[in-house]
């Protein structure tokens, strides 16, 4: 094993082992698909991501919402489903402030039009554009409106479901969900349930002032839900180039672009941008910023040239993708990524940085883009880090790692590495400091 302060490996000078093609964990041949149900119109399809979300069908008994509202619009099981929502909601209060509240049954909305605006603010805690009571699912066909949700203290959320499924067919490029608060807030939140999005083309931003835990998309599911409908995953079909998710904390830790607290994250294709940025300089808190996080597995299809996952922190630990349990290595969680034409970046001022890290195995397809990790403190940095096996297709892009005082490894596989480095591929590790070491490949 080579070790030096700076180690650079070019594919033109090295022939690695034969490439290993990476695939998706849940292939169409192995995964049941329920999209063949006969319905008048289906507003969302998640093509066999391992779980198909609730489908939304148009019917003739829907009620439209237009005009202006300065109080919460409550819906119950006895009310008609909503058709097109084009209203403006201006609702302010001190706690549990909502634009639309699904109190029973299923909150079904055909479309939230582009001229719909949710201005919901709390002078203390708990502000929601759309919210439900316990056991109520949310089913939205198309979302094109604007959500401006704020709380002076904690828990501002654009859309929250307290049921088993929060399903949105299409979030259009006109859609905007803007969240501001000072602690624990979310763009879209499935509490004790699953979050399904067919197409993500809009913009979601969550900005916290002094506190912790900003999440763009969040599923907090059932810890015991290991089989069956899996009410704990985040599933996205197509993440378009116009789509973006940003989760930022000005002074706190816990920034997450997409997080499944107990389940999986599955994305068919990524052409948009996912960013997690933590302004915390607290060196006692690990896992400060993560672009995509899942307790179980992460399955990410191909990343186009415009696709990116970025995690940055002024404090401890930044990961572009992280699969596993934050408290240790009790889980064997895997990451599968298709071809990478875009960029995966992680930057930490004090703690560990890794483009992608799994507590199990990590598989990546061909790499023509960039995967990088850097730690400016005396901490480790890894381009790709697998506690077990690491496999890649042909690398014709760049995979790099840099640290100011510890170990840097571009490719790290605890149980071995299988890769092919193409003629234009660059595998680079840079480590500065007397005790620092750099490895292009380390196993």
PLM feature segments, named:
Residues 1-57:
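Gram-negative bacterial Sec-dependent N-terminal signal peptides
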